[in-house]
């Protein structure tokens, strides 16, 4: 029952965010002049940096506060990853004899239990596979947020005038707390129970009477090598998006290396910028698509997470593209907003 409560709490949070934030973006994207006032209102809340409406400077904070998202993301994801990994090693070990990869992976990604949150019909081996899959997803998320944190300090040089609405700031904090939890929400209660028991044992027995946990590097990593094809395909797609986002962020950061350019905007070139105006947004969608595939694609919570990322960044990319077209007369005509040859 606790598992159901956690899962539906996370799903409820995503559904609420969809109604409050994504639905207005969809309505604002309808191409009709009757919605101009509504569109400006939405952009005043959702815009940031160069696409923030000039009249919306009230209730804004510097865009460099983006770093707060990644500090929260790194700390929270690290805690979830460490707890889940310890739980997996101690309570869900995998042996090569019992771990029949193709059968387990195909069943967990199959149709009969799609979107299910119940584990009563799972065998112990299938449940252990599910736990190690969560470890894999959190490990990918850790790689992502750690790079974003490093970039926020050493790559991006925000214009002093770049700001974002305070509601957008809170939305970012919400995202980097809820996104990692979404990747492991179906096992979070048992992991929390395991951690609670370990803490209680430590408090009750004291440090001198608590046995040091055994650590075997091979046994801690080898189960990840036994995951299914969906996990490795998803991981490869994730890394593809991750690498291109790193390159695109490096290009954007290089545009402001000269202090005299701190307040200037320059047309970026290189990597996926040859095709779209916001390739870093496209790469973000690609890497979250990788997480979705690696999850098996059967958890509606992760679908809600992916949909939020895709909808939010598609809208932001469209506004960014229109800004570029207004700002630069020589802007490349062959570039699309975010999806090559489509939009």
Curated annotation (Swiss-Prot):
Keywords: Endoplasmic reticulum, Membrane, NADP, Oxidoreductase, Transmembrane, Transmembrane helix. It is found in: Endoplasmic reticulum membrane. It is a multi-pass membrane protein. InterPro entries: 3-oxo-5_a-steroid_4-DH_C, Dfg10/SRD5A3. GO terms for molecular function: polyprenal reductase activity. Coiled coil: none annotated. Belongs to the steroid 5-alpha reductase family. Polyprenal reductase subfamily. This is Polyprenal reductase 2. It comes from Arabidopsis thaliana (Mouse-ear cress).
């Amino acid at each position: 029952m606790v598992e159901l409560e956690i899962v539906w709490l996370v799903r409820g949070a995503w559904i609420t965010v969809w109604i409050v934030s994504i639905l207005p973006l969809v309505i604002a994207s309808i191409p009709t002049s009757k919605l101009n006032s509504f569109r400006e209102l939405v952009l005043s809340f959702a815009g940031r940096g160069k696409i923030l409406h000039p009249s919306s400077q009230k209730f804004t904070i510097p865009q460099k506060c983006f770093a707060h998202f990644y500090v929260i993301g790194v700390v929270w994801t690290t805690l979830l990853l460490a707890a889940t990994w310890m739980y997996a090693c101690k309570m869900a070990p995998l042996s090569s004899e019992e771990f029949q990869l193709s059968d387990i992976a195909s069943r967990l990604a199959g149709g009969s239990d799609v979107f299910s949150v119940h584990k009563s019909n799972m065998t112990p081996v299938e449940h252990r596979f599910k736990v190690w899959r969560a470890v894999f997803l959190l490990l990918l998320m850790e790689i992502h947020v750690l790079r974003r944190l490093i970039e926020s300090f050493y790559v991006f040089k925000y214009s002093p005038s770049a700001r974002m609405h305070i509601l957008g700031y809170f939305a970012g904090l919400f995202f980097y707390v809820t996104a990692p939890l979404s990747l492991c929400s179906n096992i979070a209660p048992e992991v929390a129970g395991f951690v609670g028991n370990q803490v209680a044992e430590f408090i009750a027995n004291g440090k001198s009477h608590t046995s040091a946990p055994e650590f075997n590097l091979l046994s801690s990593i080898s189960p990840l090598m036994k995951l299914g094809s969906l996990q490795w395909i998803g991981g490869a797609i994730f890394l593809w998006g991750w690498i291109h986002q790193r390159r695109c962020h490096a290009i954007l950061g290089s545009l402001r290396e000269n202090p005299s350019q701190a307040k200037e905007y320059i047309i970026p070139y290189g990597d996926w910028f040859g095709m779209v105006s916001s390739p870093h947004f496209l790469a973000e969608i690609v890497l979250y698509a990788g997480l979705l595939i690696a999850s098996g694609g059967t958890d509606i919570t992760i679908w809600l997470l992916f949909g939020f990322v895709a909808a939010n960044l598609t809208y932001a990319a469209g506004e960014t593209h229109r800004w570029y077209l207004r700002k630069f007369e020589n802007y490349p005509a062959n570039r699309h907003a975010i999806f090559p040859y489509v939009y």
